[in-house]
Every structure is written in structure tokens, then in C-alpha cells.
Amino acid sequence: MESPAVTFTLAYVVFSVCFVFTPNEFHSAGITVQNLLSGWLGSEDVAFVHYHIRRSSATLLAHSLLPMGYFIGMCFAAPEKELYNVHKAADGWKVFVLMAVLLPIATSILAFYWSQKRWSNHPLAKTLAHHALPQSSWRAVASSINTEFRRIDKFATGAPSARVIVTDTWVMKVTTYKVDVAQQQDIHLTVTDSRQHELSPDSNTPVQFITIRVASINPRVKPFDIRLNSTEYGELREKLHAPIRNAANIVIHQTLGDMFLDTFRSLVEANHTYEISSNQELEPCIGCMQTNANIKLVKYCQEANEGECQQCYCRPMWCLTCMGKWFASRQDQQHPETWLSSQVPCPTCRAKFCIVDVCIVR
């Protein structure tokens, strides 16, 4: 392929990925299926279930048209290939065109099947039917969900492609092509995983995401996972009726201070250590009096007479956790992105130090 074709291919790949996974920039610009078809989809607040039935169907159709869009674009980007004359095109392009034509046809047939019987064939309608009473239908369940979603006390979090919504009766996970639904009175919740990232793209602070398994006692309801920021864990628990089991004993950091302590600990453990003689006994930490002091401040960040940090001559008097809490307490709470690079005074002698100067006693 020549330069225009290569440029178009790269640009179209980036556009397709962003159109499918919709980053914040695309949402702000309104380049989403929800925004482009807002007139047909209706309002999520008015009819949550019917909105997502239509949204998931429209999203599948829109995404299936992306290969055809690429082929049409290539007809203009590489006119010398004469792709518009399929019979003269290379075999690889013939296969691609066939796929680009069959894919939207197949999804159109599937969407048409879903729309029959007033959308009763849609996967979301069938999911709701599992929760319906014997003499009722999925529409009664949809009405209940629509009513509860309109209330302002619901719990809602997550990106548009993976939202978690909890109402008084229902736990729901909204993804690009489907909506998982479970009834609160029927579920067991278990924390299964935890991932910590050093920096959040939104706030430049450490962030922890936890994964919770939602399993229903109803055998027809498939289990699903929800993922949320650990700082929202407490709010989620308040909205749930069932307890959340932590079978893996995962430490959940519900505050910024908790996450900072974990990062502080990992950084200090990678620092220089401070050796003491075998006959020297460590005193209890004067901060908590629960464990022995195991931290000594030694200036390692720069040479002795350089920088703002100073040499501390105090004996070990603090444990790692208490020193981390002291370090966090002296920071600007409005700018957590500066915490790791700042200096604070020693809690005893007031000599300034940074994280690099914190040494574990061995």
C-alpha cells in the first residue's frame, strides 16, 4: 500500500477502536451510538430497559458496518487499486468485501429477530423473564427496574462501556452489547480480585480497582463480575442488602490515605536499609505502641550539603505504618499528585526528609 492508503488505514483503525471503546474525548464530541441515535433510542431515565434494548441492538449494527466503511474509504484512498471493481480486486480484498457485506446483513437479521413480539426475543428481555413471577412477564420486571432507576438514591459508577448500577431491588452491569441483571434478594457477592495502579488518568493519584462476583441462587441467571474503584466500596455496601464476602482476604483501600500507605510501604521497602548491632534493642513505636520501631531516617537523596533534606540524628522511634501516616498528614490534601515527591519534617527533631531517606531497620 502507498502512503495515502497507509495513512487512511492507521487513521481508520484508531477511529474504529475509539468508536467501539468510546474514550472520554469521543463522548465529549458526541461521537457515540447513543448520541448519534438519541432520537430513536429515547431517554434512559424514562425507560431504562427499552433504552438499552434498542441501544445494544443499534450498537451491534453500527459496529458491524465498520469493515464496509473501511472498504469504501480505501476506494478513495487507493484509487489505483480499482477496489470499486470487485471482480478485478485481489482475492484478499474479495474475501474482505464478502465479510463486510455479510456481517451487517447477519446483524440486521439478528436485530430484526430480537425486535419481534415487541422485543421479547432480545437477550435482555429473556434475562428479565428469569426474574418474573409465574403469572407475570418480563415487562413487569422492566417496569420495576425503570421505576427504581429514576430514583436519585441509586448507586451508579463506571465508564459508559462498563457501568455498575444498584437500586433497591436490582444489581445491574451495563456493557457495550448486553446488560446483566440480578435481584438483590437472590445474590451472593464475593470479592475475587484487586488491581492497584500507581496513577489514575483522571487525578494523577494511586487508584485501586476491585472485582466483585455477583452470583444468583436462581440457576437461570448467569453470574457476572462488577468492577469499581475501592473508594466507592463503602457506598456500594450501603446500597446492597447482602454482605460482601472477601474470601481471598484482599486488602481494600477505601480512602486515598490507605492507597498512599500501600505505595509508601512499597517504595520504602526498595530503599537502603539501616543496620543495627545485634545487642541493640528496638523500643516500641511511640506512634502506636503496638509494634517495635523499625524506621531510621538517613539522608540518601542527595549529598550531605545539597537540597532541602537534612540529616536526622534521632534513634529509631517510629514504625513504617506510623511514619507513612505522618508523611501523609503533612501533605496538601488538595494536591495528592505531589505527595511522593515532597519533603516533610521528622516528627521528633523536625529535620526535613523525603521518601528516599526512609530506611527500614535490619
Swiss-Prot record:
Main localization category: endoplasmic reticulum
UniProt KW keywords: Endoplasmic reticulum, Membrane, Metal-binding, Transferase, Transmembrane, Transmembrane helix, Ubl conjugation pathway, Unfolded protein response, Zinc, Zinc-finger
Topological category with respect to the lipid bilayer: Multi-pass membrane protein
EC numbers on record: 2.3.2.27
UniProt keyword Isomerase present: no
A Pfam family hit: Tmpp129
Listed GO biological process terms: protein ubiquitination; response to unfolded protein
TM helices/strands, residue ranges: 7-27, 57-77, 95-115
Involved pathway(s): Protein modification; protein ubiquitination
Subcellular location(s) per record: Endoplasmic reticulum membrane
Zn-finger region bounds: RING-type: 285-350
UniProt superkingdom: Eukaryota
Gene Ontology molecular function, alphabetical: ubiquitin protein ligase activity; zinc ion binding
Lumenal side: 1-6, 78-94
Residue intervals annotated with topology Cytoplasmic: 28-56, 116-362
Record field: catalytic activity: S-ubiquitinyl-[E2 ubiquitin-conjugating enzyme]-L-cysteine + [acceptor protein]-L-lysine = [E2 ubiquitin-conjugating enzyme]-L-cysteine + N(6)-ubiquitinyl-[acceptor protein]-L-lysine
Any one cellular-component term (Gene Ontology): endoplasmic reticulum membrane
Subunit-level organization: Integral component of ER-resident dislocation complexes.
UniProt similarity note: Belongs to the TMEM129 family.
PANTHER family: E3 UBIQUITIN-PROTEIN LIGASE TM129
Domain notes per entry: The RING-type zinc finger domain is responsible for E3 ubiquitin ligase activity.
Function: E3 ubiquitin-protein ligase involved in ER-associated protein degradation, preferentially associates with the E2 enzyme UBE2J2.
Protein name per its UniProtKB record: E3 ubiquitin-protein ligase TM129
Organism per entry: Xenopus laevis
